[in-house]
Amino acid sequence: MCLRAAPENIIQHKRNDRNMRKLMLAIAALCVSMTLVAQDKYKTLKDISYVSADDTSAYRRERCKLDMYVPEGRKGFKTIVWFHGGALEGGSKELRPELQNAGIAIVAPNYRLFPRCKCPDYTRDAAAAVAWTVKHIAEYGGDPSQVYVGGHSAGGYLTLMLALDKSYLAEYGVDADSIRAYYPVSGQTATHYTIRKERKISYTLPIVDKYAPLNNARKLGTRLVLYTGDRHLEQMARYEENLYLKAVLEGLGNKEIPIYELSGFDHGGVVTPACLLIKGDMTK
């Protein structure tokens, strides 16, 4: 199926429209690439543990499993690790259908959730899942130098934390800048509101501390692409937080950070068009 995207439904904040033309070309190329790989075969693998079997936490052993969607008969393919949303309190691993049938692998991890764990356990689990992918994807035919990371909502927050605070992936022997690109969709850039909830702080009171992506802004050695829903339909200040992060990162000397505001889509609805754009970016 060919994706038809009307330019008026996508707002991209850039300093020139050359990049918007690139976006439209990427979507057109995606239509072609989907046709080329439509006949490829894929296999789905379920509930692979990405932590040690002798981990002392029974809940971690229970929760820290991932599913994989892998091209068969291909070598050197790209892989995206995709983190589900759910406010760090709910949700489950999902092999997003919008990312499928494009010649890439999808790794979809679960991670521990509040209230059975607390910050920073969520982010440490996310880092462990990405590190497992980097270290093991070659066993399935993938290229470990072509690993991407993305996620929606809480998954977007985790994506941002892994991109900006290098210590999480470093704990597992992976350089955050070795990831090819990060694609957070509607992620909070202040400290996540569930982490505020742990501390009995109001949902509406923004906190920027070491658990805020903003607080960890740095000069990046890889790509970061931001996606949000329509500023009038998104969760409170979600678009504005991401726009501010873009400004902070560029102020630190990063090459322009793209941000896509997807007009007409609310917080839940934005994940589908964002995933299609991500797939287009990965396969261009």
Model region roles, listed by residue range:
Residues 76-85:
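Short beta-strand element of the alpha/beta-hydrolase
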Residues 39-74:
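N-terminal cap/lid segment of alpha/beta-hydrolase-fold proteins
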Residues 100, 199-209, 228-258:
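Active-site-adjacent alpha-helix of alpha/beta-hydrolase-fold enzymes
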Residues 92-109:
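Short amphipathic alpha-helix adjacent to the substrate-entry channel of hydrolases
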Residues 227, 243, 250-284:
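C-terminal catalytic histidine-bearing segment of alpha/beta-hydrolase fold enzymes
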Residues 134-197:
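Primarily recognizes the serine-hydrolase "nucleophile elbow" in alpha/beta-hydrolase
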Residues 184-216:
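Mobile cap/lid helix-loop segments that gate and shape the active-site cleft of serine hydrolases
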Residues 117-138:
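Alpha/beta-hydrolase active-site loop
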